[in-house]
Amino acid sequence: MLRTMFKSKIHRATVTQADLHYVGSVTIDADLLDAADLLPGELVHIVDITNGARLETYVIEGERGSGVVGINGAAAHLVHPGDLVIIISYAQVSDAEARALRPRVVHVDRDNRVVALGADPAEPVPGSDQARSPQAVTA
């Protein structure tokens, strides 16, 4: 049996562009891809914190150091420049691998620069006003 497990996320990234006329996908700065262990073409889920929209698409590598998080194609109807999003990837792994899997959590600033790396999916952004859910167990 394979389990689908949380593999990585880029937490609270700011959407820098959205264009209906681009080929559908999400363009992400190569520095963020490396930090989150994401590959071009990889399936990701995007959760829009600003409006609650959720979608899935695939990754296109963006210019390294640019801070780009660009929503392309039809998804631009749902996600807009300035929105805060969480970009999440999953992995299908064996039960033994699932029990040992340490996800990558990438916290970014308003310019989509990495400010902290971690493995706890419930950890709030360092230095923010966010709080850990009181019911969440520390990873």
From Swiss-Prot:
Its EC number is 4.1.1.11. Binds 1 pyruvoyl group covalently per subunit. Residues 117-139 are annotated as: Disordered. It comes from the Bacteria. CDD domains: Asp_decarbox. Its main location: cytoplasm. It is found in: Cytoplasm. Keywords: Autocatalytic cleavage, Cytoplasm, Decarboxylase, Lyase, Pantothenate biosynthesis, Pyruvate, Schiff base, Zymogen. InterPro entries: Asp_de-COase-like_dom_sf, Asp_decarbox. Its cofactor is pyruvate. NCBIfam families: panD (TIGR00223). Heterooctamer of four alpha and four beta subunits. Catalyzes the pyruvoyl-dependent decarboxylation of aspartate to produce beta-alanine. This is Aspartate 1-decarboxylase. It comes from Streptomyces avermitilis (strain ATCC 31267 / DSM 46492 / JCM 5070 / NBRC 14893 / NCIMB 12804 / NRRL 8165 / MA-4680).
